[in-house]
From Swiss-Prot:
Gene3D superfamilies: Ribulose bisphosphate carboxylase, large subunit, C-terminal domain (3.20.20.110), RuBisCO large subunit, N-terminal domain (3.30.70.150). Binds 1 Mg(2+) ion per subunit. One of its GO terms (molecular function) is ribulose-bisphosphate carboxylase activity. The disulfide bond which can form in the large chain dimeric partners within the hexadecamer appears to be associated with oxidative stress and protein turnover. The active site is at K155 (proton acceptor), H274 (proton acceptor). Its cofactor is Mg(2+). This is Ribulose bisphosphate carboxylase large chain. PANTHER family: RIBULOSE BISPHOSPHATE CARBOXYLASE, RIBULOSE BISPHOSPHATE CARBOXYLASE LARGE CHAIN. It is found in: Plastid, Chloroplast. It comes from Anemia mexicana.
């Protein structure tokens, strides 16, 4: 077993590196646990088999090359594992995750295990096409520059008829929002079949565009029970002239997501990604996967927007960590910085960026903080923060747009929003 623990190993530029937070069972030394993680997530199995002799395990095995105790925690360690590039199929997030996190989390020697970060080398990231369009192309399509974009999730999320749904969309867009959004739970239920919804929403889009002179969008949720149906919905959205569709990438799966991203790239649709189910995976501090890994894999799989939490009203430490994965979504090159939870330097080599979407419990009073924290390249999404306005949807949308324009102008004139 311990041949998988190799502290003298020098990592290669082409290795995929992983940082695992391990909690070994009592009595299991951390080196043994680290070796077990490296073995089980690469070439090893529970015993030595004679067919090991038919290949060069030295060439293909994962190696645990460093272990450090976690500050302030008893019996928790960060194990660093290096995987040779040949273990993974090119351009497949599905295969990457199946290999690295597929089996090892049920391991008996471990009480808990969490994948904190992955370093994706350029040699591997270059096999992915990434986001269908990216931040710059999206701005050019929408002709909107120099400010964050505004969105709104239509509420109540379930129960509206297609016609009333379209009316709510129209009021929000007419009031000044850039986007409205299907809730992630809206697919094609008996009271709101997808085709009816798409038609009424398209009508709302074009009416509000004609009246405001701005390009408008609505994230039409194309998520479906199977891939063919999903693509069919995306095709219909494109035929209606909608600029953007949406996908729930964790419940839909990475294979479906990459398929949809390919379609969107080839047909000029933007792709909005919702992270429904993420907390099942990333909520526990000592088990599962950190959201920054889900964010990195999404950037590879493909999406132009992804929900990334809000920061506002959370603890200060959370803020730095959230900004860490916001940078991982947007920037080309991100330096290692443990205070922000970034375990490895990540070089995306000009893969297009993803716009982080701030949504969940935010309203106009948060606007100065949000513009300060997220900057221009983001989507600020107010659901109840728009629709909860005492005068209705359109005035709620106006309030958001006015607040945003005021904050952006104040910032451009040199005022310190954070201090104020």
């Amino acid at each position: 077993r311990l041949t998988y623990y190799t502290p003298q190993y020098q990592t290669k530029d082409t290795d995929i590196l992983a940082a695992f937070r391990m909690t070994p069972q009592p009595g299991v030394p951390p080196e043994e646990a680290g070796a077990a993680v490296a073995a089980e997530s690469s070439t090893g199995t529970w015993t030595t088999v004679w067919t090991d002799g038919l290949t060069s395990l030295d060439r293909y095995k994962g190696r645990c090359y460093d272990i450090e105790p976690v500050a302030g925690e008893t019996n928790q360690y960060i194990a660093y594992v290096a995987y040779p590039l040949d273990l993974f199929e090119e351009g497949s997030v599905t295969n990457l995750l199946t290999s690295i996190v597929g089996n090892v989390f049920g391991f008996k020697a471990l009480r808990a295990l969490r994948l904190e970060d992955l370093r994706i080398p350029p040699a591997y990231s270059k096999t992915f096409l990434g986001p269908p369009h990216g931040i710059q192309v999206e701005r050019d399509k929408l002709n909107k520059y120099g400010r964050p974009l505004l969105g709104c999730t239509i509420k109540p999320k379930l129960g509206l008829s297609a016609k009333n749904y379209g009316r709510a969309v129209y009021e929000c867009l007419r009031g000044g929002l850039d986007f409205t959004k299907d809730d992630e739970t809206v697919n094609s239920q008996p009271f709101i079949r997808w085709r009816d919804r798409f038609l009424f929403v398209a009508e709302a889009l074009f009416k509000s565009q004609a009246e405001t002179g701005e390009i408008k969008g609505h994230y039409l949720n194309a998520t479906a029970g199977h891939c063919d149906e999903m693509i069919k919905r995306a095709v219909f959205a494109r035929e209606l002239g909608a600029p953007i569709v949406m996908h729930d990438y964790l419940t839909g799966g990475y294979t479906a997501n990459t398929s949809l991203a390919f379609y969107c790239r080839d047909n000029g649709l933007l792709l909005h990604i919702h992270r429904a189910m993420h907390a099942v995976i990333d909520r526990q501090k000592n088990h599962g996967m950190h959201f920054r890994v889900l964010a990195k894999t999404l950037r590879m799989s493909g999406g132009d927007h992804i929900h990334a939490g809000t920061v506002v009203g959370k603890l200060e430490g959370e803020r730095e960590v959230t900004l860490g994965f916001v940078d991982l979504l947007r920037d080309d090159y991100i330096e290692k910085d443990r205070s922000r939870g970034i375990y490895f330097t990540q070089d995306w080599v000009s893969m297009p960026g993803v716009l982080p979407v701030a949504s969940g419990g935010i309203h106009v009073w948060h606007m100065p903080a949000l513009t300060e924290i997220f900057g221009d390249d983001s989507v600020l999404q107010f659901g109840g923060g728009t629709l909860g306005h005492p005068w209705g949807n359109a005035p709620g949308a106006v309030a958001n747009r006015v607040a945003l324009e005021a904050c952006v102008q104040a910032r451009n004139e040199g005022r310190d929003l954070a201090r104020e």
